[in-house]
Regions:
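Intramembrane alpha-helical segments
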Residues: 9-10, 83-170
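The first (N-terminal) embedded transmembrane alpha-helix
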Residues: 14-33, 146-150
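Hydrophobic membrane-targeting signal helices
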Residues: 24, 28, 64, 109, ...
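Functional transmembrane core segments of multi-pass inner-membrane proteins
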Residues: 32-50, 118-124, 128, 143-195
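Short, Lys/Arg-rich, polar N-terminal cytosolic tail immediately upstream
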Residues: 1-11
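Solvent-exposed interhelical
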Residues: 54-107, 176-198
Length: 198
């Protein structure tokens, strides 16, 4: 495989789809919660396809912007020093171009939804950009990741109902605690490097 193509795949984490699945699950929770029957799910199958595509595209965009912000830190961490931006197999300008391309595709997908979903989706994009920066100002970046990764619950629910009742925020909260759990475990593997970097 061409080395550059392999670097693009690694940058977008296409070799590791589990992150996309973790982003997709909350979207599916929202879509299913908003559906009153299997028949309604079948009728809205196009929305499910849209959310599957959106989850994979925006997870990749999130990984790219994360690596852009963390490129100088990733060099110092054993687990991340071989990432394409850290080892300079991809330039910063290439990475920015990939991020803009992925974000543009994500926006096109988002614009196929209703107005409320678009508004929440734009909020999620802001969170996606803010998350990497929170690692510099708080000991709880997992909370911001959880807010970002689970907002699909709200987008999915709104995509079908065009409303966001108070009750759906309980499901959002469940997702937040779920992500806090698994991401804290994931982050723990870097604890020695985090301490040495400060």
């Amino acid at each position: 495989m061409n080395h550059k193509i392999k670097s693009y795949i690694l940058l977008m984490r296409l070799n590791s789809p589990i992150g996309s699945m973790l982003l997709l699950y909350p979207c599916l929770w929202g879509l299913i919660s908003a559906s009153s029957s299997f028949e309604e799910i079948r009728q809205n199958i196009f929305l499910f396809i849209i959310f599957i595509l959106g989850a994979f595209i925006m997870r990749s965009a999130g990984c790219v912007i994360n690596d852009i912000f963390d490129r100088n830190i990733d060099i110092q961490v054993d687990r991340t020093k071989s990432r394409p931006l850290a080892d300079k197999s991809i330039s910063l300008y290439e990475s920015i171009a990939i991020f803009i391309t992925l974000s543009s595709i994500g926006l096109c997908i988002l614009l196929s939804l209703n107005t409320l979903s678009i508004k929440v989706g734009l909020l999620s994009f802001i969170l996606l950009i803010i998350y990497p920066l929170t690692k510099r100002i708080t000991y709880w970046p997992q909370l911001f990741l959880a807010l970002t990764f689970n907002i699909g619950v709200l987008i999915g629910y709104a995509a079908i109902t065009n409303i966001l009742p108070f009750e759906i925020y309980f499901l959002y909260a469940v997702g937040i605690f779920w992500t806090l759990g698994y991401d804290t475990i994931y982050a723990y593997q870097d604890i020695d490097d985090d301490i040495s970097i400060g």
